[in-house]
Structure formats: C-alpha cells, structure tokens
C-alpha cells in the first residue's frame, strides 16, 4: 500500500505571504538606509521601523507554518504474483575449521595494540595473532598475561570483545545425547553419594539429589527398646497413673480410634535430658487395666556426672605467672 502526500496551498495564503514578505523587505531596506546615514543626520526613531520589520517577517513565518496541510490518498495495491510452489531456500553451512589446542602453559607478552575478536565468526578460533594479548582457558592450565585485564574487556552487542584482550576458549566437551535425540536437562542436580557412609551399616546408602557439601544419607531408624506392662488403674481419672521408681511429666495426649479414653504421653523428669519415654492407655478389653509402654533407656548416671563435674570446673581460677 502506497501513500501519496500532496500539498495543496490555497491561493489566498500565497497572496498573503507575498504581501507580508514584500512589506518586510521594504521596511528592512528603509531601516538599512536610515542606519547608513551619519549619526548627526538621523532624525527618525529606528525602533519603530525595526518592530514593524520583525512583525512582518513573523507573519510570513506563521503563514508558512499554517499553509500546506497534507492530504493522504491510498494508492493502488501491487500484489506480487502468487505461485503455488515456494522458491527453494538455499542453506549454506560453513566448512568445519580445525581448532588448534592451546599449549599447557603460555605467557604471551605484547606491546602493540590489541585486536577485536568476533565470536560470530567460526574462523577466528583457528588463528592467533602475535599483536594481541592472549588469555587461554584449558583443562590442564589457566594462564593470564601480566599486562592484560580480563575484567576490563567490554563485550559489544554483536558478540565481539573490544578495548581489551582477545580471548581464545578451549572447545567445550561434547554433550551426551539421549535416545530421543535431545540433550539431557542441565537443571537436574548431580546425584552423588557420601563416601564416608558408603559401606556403613548405620546408613541406608541411598544417593542424595542435592549438590551441596553436606551429607544427605538417610539415617536408619534406631530400634528403641519397648517394654509393655499391664497394671491396674488407680482411679477412673485419666490423669491418675500408677507410680513407679521414676518421676514423669505429661507432655501430650492423643485420641485412640475405637476407645473413649485418650493415650497420654510422658517423659522422665527425674534428671534433665533423660531420653526415657512412656505412654499410658486404657485396655480395650478391660477398662480397669492400664497398658503402660516404656521406650528408651534412662540415662541418669551421665547426668549426675555432668552435674558434679560442672561446678568443679567453674570453680577453677587460671592465674598468669
């Protein structure tokens, strides 16, 4: 679609422009004649003539800006000849270039001006120029020239490196292709196994999916010692439990399916930090009997040893000679 712009000025606008321009030119000539005379012969005020001249030229400018409004007309649409078969697209692939392997250790010193490396051209990697400061990255070595700064190089929008040192990158290792023809997803974490617990019986030996340095082997569940006894209930109250040689503190309860009496959970409060637990519930066959299940072992000897050692250590005074 073409658009033709046509300027059609009106006749009256052209006449007004010509009149204003002629008056402005005449007043400007008169002002020049007045200014060309000698100062003692000047009897006319030049400010009025100047204002009149400027006003006429301003009028000309306003008329020129106002005249000549554009009109748009839609031109004929030139449709290309339709063809049933599209033209064949010719695809050209660049010839493979031989990539030269970098030396294990290389220090290149250059005093000349550095050149620009364009990453879009495949033939740049095969040639090395002596006038550029080279930064090489290889699997076996990593060398940077002493006069170059890798961080100061600016990468332009087309992929070229300018105002810095040229870079020669080692070829990347081949990405393994799966049976479906697509490379594996890079977002999957590297699954590794903890070498400390590889042959340990205390761990399940399953591999972990996270890549941080902590061990994520699943610990096997310890078999706690459980002992169940049936004792007669002291009273009908749930909080009343038969006493034994230890003191217990209730820390929760849980309803039992099919029983109106909940199960109470207790932990040993004889010594702080004792891992022994027990839970008490009513027997389903006989409501006058209680089923007490003990879990864990009492560790009161270690707690008493710590209580005796702690005040003795705190009472020591270290003096300097």
UniProtKB/Swiss-Prot annotation:
DNA-binding region: 237-303
Signal peptide boundaries: none
Region (Disordered): 71-91
InterPro entries per the UniProt record, alphabetical: WRKY_dom, WRKY_dom_sf, WRKY_plant, Zn-cluster-dom
Principal place of residence: nucleus
Subcellular location: Nucleus
GO MF, any single term: transcription cis-regulatory region binding
GO biological processes: defense response to bacterium
GO CC entries: nucleus
Record keywords, A-Z: DNA-binding, Nucleus, Transcription, Transcription regulation
SMART domains named in the record: WRKY (SM00774)
Keyword check for Protein transport: no
Protein purpose: Transcription factor. Interacts specifically with the W box (5'-(T)TGAC[CT]-3'), a frequently occurring elicitor-responsive cis-acting element.
Record-given protein name: Probable WRKY transcription factor 17
Organism lineage string: Eukaryota, Viridiplantae, Streptophyta, Embryophyta, Tracheophyta
Gene for this chain: WRKY17
């Amino acid at each position: 679609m073409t658009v033709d712009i046509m300027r059609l000025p009106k006749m009256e606008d052209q006449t007004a422009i010509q009149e204003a321009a002629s008056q402005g030119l005449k007043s400007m000539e008169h002002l020049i004649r007045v200014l060309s005379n000698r100062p003692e012969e000047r009897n006319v005020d030049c400010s009025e003539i100047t204002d009149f001249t400027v006003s006429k030229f301003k009028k000309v400018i306003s008329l020129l800006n106002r005249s000549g409004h554009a009109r748009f007309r839609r031109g004929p649409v030139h449709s290309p000849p339709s063809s049933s078969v599209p033209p064949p697209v010719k695809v050209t692939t660049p010839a493979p270039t031989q990539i030269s392997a970098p030396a294990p250790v290389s220090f290149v010193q250059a005093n000349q001006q550095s050149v620009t490396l364009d990453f879009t051209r495949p033939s740049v990697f095969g040639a090395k120029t002596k006038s550029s400061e080279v930064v090489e990255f290889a699997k076996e070595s990593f060398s940077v020239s002493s006069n170059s700064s890798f961080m100061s190089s600016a990468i332009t929008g087309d992929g070229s490196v300018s105002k810095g040192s040229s870079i020669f990158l080692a070829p990347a290792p081949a990405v393994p292709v799966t049976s479906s023809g697509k490379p594996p997803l890079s977002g999957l974490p590297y699954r590794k196994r903890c070498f400390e617990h590889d042959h340990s019986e205390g761990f399940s030996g399953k591999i972990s999916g996270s890549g941080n340095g902590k061990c994520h082997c699943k610990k096997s569940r310890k078999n706690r010692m459980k002992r169940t006894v049936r004792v007669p209930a002291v009273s009908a109250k749930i909080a009343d439990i038969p006493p034994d040689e230890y003191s217990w503190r209730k820390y929760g309860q849980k309803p039992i399916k099919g029983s109106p009496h909940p199960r109470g959970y207790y932990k040993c409060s004889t010594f702080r930090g004792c891992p022994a637990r027990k839970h008490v519930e009513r027997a389903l066959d006989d409501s006058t009997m209680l089923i007490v299940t003990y879990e864990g072992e009492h560790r009161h000897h270690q707690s008493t040893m710590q209580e005796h050692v702690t005040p003795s250590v705190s009472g020591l005074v270290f003096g300097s000679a």
